[in-house]
Amino acid sequence: AIYFKGDWLNQFEKESTKDKEFFSTTDNVVEVDMMAMFGESFNYGEADGVQILEMPYVGNDLSMLVILPKQGQMDKLEEDMTIENLMKWNSKLKKEKVNLFLPKFKFEIKTMLTKTLQEMGMPTAFSGNADFSGMDGIKSLQIDQVIHQAFVAVDEKGTEAAAATAVVMIESMAPLEPEEPKLFNADHPFIFMIQ
């Protein structure tokens, strides 16, 4: 099991969280607690019709990367999610002042992996022919089920996640130029990852 709890380097003010519309589809709107932050510096970039924002955690070893497609373009983003594109999008990041709107969210997922693992070449482990004698001294054990659970909660203070994978990145600094802050308004579906 993996557990992660990280506080944002730049935390949201609770007073700035307001009820706002979130367009889960172009036809479906729900009210969410939308966090807001104005004029803060983040690694930010735009490429291939998506906005990319890196939100560092205290210590700067880990961050949340938020990838926001244009509204109604989530299917295209899912198709475009390749390691090559992620590397390209990461290379476009530079320090920018950003007006950020991000919903508070929490989700939990439970997935049964038994069938998947059997199809990947592990059928014997789930049968009476399994040999786990190294665990019990006799051949009396077999796998019944494999369940994967993941939990993520994002709020003003930071992120709490279980079963998350982390990749340590080095933050590069770019000089700041005084200009209008970029708008990153996550009021529709987006993809995030902890890296």
Language-model features: where?
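Secretory/exported precursors with cleavable N-terminal leaders
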Residues: 1-195
